[in-house]
Amino acid sequence: MEHHGENPKKQVFAIIPARYSSVRLPGKMLLPIAGKPLILHTVERAREAATIDEVIVATDDHRIFEAVTAEGHQAVLTSAEHQSGSDRIAEVANSLPKGSIIVNVQGDEPVISPATIDAAVNALLHDPQADMATTCEPIESLLELLNGNNVKVVIGDNGYAVYFSRSPMPWPRDASLRHGGDPNRAIEEQPELLSNFRKHTGLYVYRREYLLKFTQLPQTKLEKFEMLEQLRALENGAKIRVVEAAAKSIGVDTEADLKLVRAILEAEEKAHEIVA
């Protein structure tokens, strides 16, 4: 863990990694939603965050680059060899000013709340001991808890991440014992137990120098076991501040996600037209 002095004049860059290829939803970054490509909605949300000075899309695809720059937004063509979004944004961050704050905004979250971005950025800016910050959301059902695609985060009383896992954590021992050792049954009969769980979301805020260091570290045992990149940071002693998201976001991974996001953004578009 490194100690970082506070500097209220730090520049804050939102970098949005955007690939064209997607196993479940090919070309999703350019799929039309309410009259514009998905990626542009994400860019606009990031630009609305009060803490963000600049928004940059990092992509290895000319189609995404052209769609973004045609609307006057910044984009950078990166290497096609990157294994993760963190590696992609690190390539861009390497040319940004020293001491900058780097926000990794997932490109496939077109309804992300600008207030969530601000909360995460401010959490890092006001905590000189933290290397990075991220966000979490409440878990509202047993189905959501048991879904391995929903990463759970355990947060200590000090507000730092203790562990991330695809498994339900922490374990409700006493409640489980009262229900024959079955935690699922315990939660079904005591849904208030869900308040003990948090879902990790994909927004990350890094100090530039830590991001560059992190992406040079070799993969760790737990990271490879759970296939969770953030465990590499924890295993190497990073302090990760976790804050509650201002609103639930939706990552577009399936046709069902796309349909839901289209309904939300088209409704917002109609509401704006009525006001205008």
Regions found by a protein language model. Name each.
Residues 56, 62-122:
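Short phosphate-binding loop-to-helix
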Residues 67, 92, 164, 213-214, ...:
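Residues that scaffold the ATP/ADP-binding catalytic core of kinase and kinase-like folds
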Residues 181-276:
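Conserved alpha/beta core of the MobA/IspD/sugar-nucleotide pyrophosphorylase nucleotidyltransferase superfamily
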Residues 113-220:
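Conserved core of the sugar-phosphate nucleotidyltransferase
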Residues 52, 98-99, 127-130, 238:
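Short, high-confidence coil segments that cap the C-terminus of an alpha-helix
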Residues 11-58:
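N-terminal glycine-rich phosphate-binding loop and ensuing alpha1 helix
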Residues 59-60, 112, 206, 253:
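A conserved hydrophobic position in a structured secondary element of the catalytic/binding core
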